[in-house]
From Swiss-Prot:
GO MF terms held by the record: structural constituent of ribosome; tRNA binding
Classification via NCBIfam families: uS10_euk_arch
Pfam families: Ribosomal_S10 (PF00338)
InterPro entries: Ribosomal_uS10 (IPR001848), Ribosomal_uS10_CS (IPR018268), Ribosomal_uS10_dom (IPR027486), Ribosomal_uS10_dom_sf (IPR036838), Ribosomal_uS10_euk/arc (IPR005729)
Annotated protein name in UniProt: Small ribosomal subunit protein uS10
Biological role stated in the UniProt entry: Involved in the binding of tRNA to the ribosomes.
Length: 102
């Protein structure tokens, strides 16, 4: 039987866990096997910027950071489960990647 690997990523861990819970509830309702969600390492993106607007004065820096959280879910590729997965309401800052593996 085919497997669907679902990779979720986003900057809000609260929204990410909400989508993971929706996927788990779909798997329980349809009765398919599920493994996960597996938390993957968080990627930290750091952008240093100068504090002074003109460039004069001492070189003081601000460091802005964005964290990208990721989750991985493997689910049996049942047709009913995949149709319901396509209808999940997903927040704008969450990215979903679904790959079918044989």
């Amino acid at each position: 039987m085919q497997k669907a690997r679902i990779r979720l990523s986003g900057i809000s861990p609260k929204d990410l866990d909400g989508v993971c819970n929706q996927v788990k509830s779909i798997a329980e309702r349809t009765g398919v096997n599920i493994s996960g969600p597996v938390p993957l390492p968080t990627k930290k993106l750091v952008v240093p910027t100068r504090k002074s607007p003109s460039g004069d004065g001492t070189a003081t820096w601000d460091h802005w950071e964005m964290r990208v959280h990721k989750r991985l879910i493997d689910i049996a590729a049942d047709e009913r489960a995949l149709r319901q997965l396509m209808r999940i309401q997903v927040p704008k800052d969450i990215n979903i990647e679904i790959v079918l593996e044989g």
